């Protein structure tokens, strides 16, 4: 076995043969068998809990399977450690990068095999070798730079260079674009294509459908720890078929849409101007209506939400809520009026990562109960958190679990649970399902429709065309800081929405 590992696989397919993994009370993987070919990008798709991450941890040597083997080329493996996996030519690039921020780029790249002379690190040789590894991949990065001073996208390139320094034949990417800019994503896609064309086996895990169809050559779908199907040709696949395969039901069932009777005017916006809005914005939303906002990056949708939630002051225009004037000088004013925001970047603006799920749910409600006394307040908060966890179906081992360890979908449901603890009239959802798996998305959509049925006006900003068409009663389109069109649900299609969203030619 060790001899085979030391021979480092340099070619051939990656095969999973009957992989099973059992944790106490949970069968995480059940008889997983499939093949990923060299010279291809092979996607692993499935809802949270489908088994994708467990399989990658087995591939990387972090977990050991209860049964089954891996095969790379002609060699079979059952890795006992990450060191054995690395020696066999495997690199797993996790969402949370395994690098040391306090060390230089060169030290990170060559950690464990730094060149030395007379027992001391030969820094000149180390920087030269690091520069060679970065050449053509990230030429702008100085090997002497402290890793923590790089952007996340640049750090990811260092991780890839580290994998290439070990002559990795199998490279697995786990949600690699979750925190990257559009430019960094384009660069990463080009690098993945290059690695594929060099004959490597690339495994790719992502919730972002557009990336799967952009860069992948084959897809394997998992559900509840079981293999469902491998699509060997992307030409055999479309978005709807892939989603149906992942969740086991038709795409239209995912959105949970159902017609509702609207219950009169809620929020009216007239001639609104402010940071990010280039022309006066006017619209109204009804009680019980789901109003979608679609647009490309930089269209002004998030900036509009910041004004409506009191985060940014308007420079002109007026607001009315339930027919009464509404003045917003701060988020406190918006919350007091019942206008509540779930922000786009939930990790930075929506949650307190080191605090518990219960504490995050009770953040907004706590000021209303400080006069009840510590004992009563503590009891109310405990009961409220448990009630919202149950109502929102937040999957957590305990209300005291730090929220940072929950999936994106469960974090989002906890944020929604926070607002349900308070009087709500208008709910602003900015990219509510970004980075969330399909099953959790369906739960979020169900919550949206339930709130609308209860008379809440729900305004949703989304860059996902299928999503905004699937859940909205009516859709407004923004481009370059202005509203460029309005479509009812039965009028909307991808072509019309994109046409309205594209920047206009200015004379």
Curated annotation (Swiss-Prot):
Family: Belongs to the ABC transporter superfamily. Arabinose importer (TC 3.A.1.2.2) family.
Role summary: Part of the ABC transporter complex AraFGH involved in arabinose import. Responsible for energy coupling to the transport system.
A GO MF term: ATP binding
Entry-linked Pfam families: ABC_tran (PF00005)
GO cellular component terms, semicolon-separated: plasma membrane
EC number: 7.5.2.12
Subunit structure of this chain's protein: The complex is composed of two ATP-binding proteins (AraG), two transmembrane proteins (AraH) and a solute-binding protein (AraF).
Ligand binding (ATP): 46-53
Reactions performed catalytically: L-arabinose(out) + ATP + H2O = L-arabinose(in) + ADP + phosphate + H(+)
Residues in ABC transporter domain copies: 14-249, 249-505
Record's bilayer topology term: Peripheral membrane protein
Gene3D superfamilies cross-referenced by the UniProt entry: P-loop containing nucleotide triphosphate hydrolases
Record keywords: ATP-binding, Cell inner membrane, Cell membrane, Membrane, Nucleotide-binding, Repeat, Sugar transport, Translocase, Transport
PROSITE patterns: ABC_TRANSPORTER_1 (PS00211), ABC_TRANSPORTER_2 (PS50893), ARAG (PS51268)
InterPro entries: AAA+_ATPase, ABC_carbohydrate_import_ATPase, ABC_transporter-like_ATP-bd, ABC_transporter-like_CS, P-loop_NTPase
Compartments reported by the entry: Cell inner membrane
Top-level lineage group: Bacteria
Predominant localisation class: membrane
The protein, known as: Arabinose import ATP-binding protein AraG
């Amino acid at each position: 076995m060790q001899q085979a590992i030391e021979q480092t696989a340099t070619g051939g397919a990656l095969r999973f043969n009957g992989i099973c993994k059992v944790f106490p009370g949970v069968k995480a993987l059940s008889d997983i068998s499939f093949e990923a070919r060299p010279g291809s990008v092979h996607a692993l798709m499935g809802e949270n809990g489908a088994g994708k991450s467990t399989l990658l941890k087995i591939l990387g040597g972090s977990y050991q399977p209860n049964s089954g083997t891996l095969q790379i080329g002609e060699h079979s493996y059952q890795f006992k450690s990450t060191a054995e996996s690395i020696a066999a030519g495997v690199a797993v690039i996790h969402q949370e990068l395994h690098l040391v921020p306090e060390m230089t780029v060169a030290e990170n790249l060559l950690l464990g095999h730094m060149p030395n002379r007379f027992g001391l690190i030969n820094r000149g040789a180390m920087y030269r070798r690091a520069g060679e590894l970065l050449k053509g991949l990230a030429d702008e990065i100085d090997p002497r730079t402290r890793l923590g001073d790089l952007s996340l996208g640049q750090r990811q390139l260092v991780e890839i260079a580290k994998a290439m320094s070990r002559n990795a034949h199998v490279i697995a990417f786990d949600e690699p674009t979750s925190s990257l800019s559009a430019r960094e994503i384009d660069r990463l896609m080009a690098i993945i294509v290059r690695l594929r064309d060099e004959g490597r086996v690339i495994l790719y895990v992502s919730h972002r459908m557009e990336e799967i169809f952009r860069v992948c050559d084959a897809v394997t779908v998992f559900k509840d720890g079981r293999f469902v199907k491998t699509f060997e040709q992307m030409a055999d696949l479309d978005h709807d078929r892939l989603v149906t395969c992942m969740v086991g039901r038709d795409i239209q069932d995912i959105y949970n849409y159902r017609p509702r009777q609207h219950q009169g005017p809620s929020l009216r916006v007239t001639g609104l101007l402010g940071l990010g809005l280039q022309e006066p914005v006017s619209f109204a939303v009804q009680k019980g209506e789901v109003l979608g906002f679609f647009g490309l990056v930089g269209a002004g949708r998030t900036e509009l939400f910041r004004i409506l939630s009191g985060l940014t002051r308007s420079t002109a225009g007026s607001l009315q809520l339930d027919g009464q004037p509404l003045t917003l000088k701060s988020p406190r004013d918006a919350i007091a009026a019942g206008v509540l925001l779930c922000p786009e970047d939930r990790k930075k603006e929506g949650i307190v990562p080191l605090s518990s799920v219960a504490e995050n749910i009770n953040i907004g409600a706590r000021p209303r109960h400080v006069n009840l006394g510590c004992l009563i307040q503590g009891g109310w908060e405990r009961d409220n958190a448990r009630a919202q966890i149950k109502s929102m179906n937040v999957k957590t081992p305990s209300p005291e679990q730090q929220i940072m360890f929950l999936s994106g979908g469960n974090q989002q449901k906890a944020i929604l649970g926070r607002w349900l603890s308070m009087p709500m009239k208008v709910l602003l959802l900015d990219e509510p399902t970004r980075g969330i798996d399909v099953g959790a998305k369906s739960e979020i959509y169900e919550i949206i429709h339930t709130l609308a049925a209860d008379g809440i006006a729900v305004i949703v900003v989304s860059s996902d065309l299928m999503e905004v068409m699937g859940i909205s009663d009516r859709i407004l389109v923004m481009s370059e800081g202005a509203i460029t069109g309005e479509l009812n649900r039965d009028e909307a299609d991808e072509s019309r929405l994109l046409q309205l969203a594209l920047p206009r030619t200015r004379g």
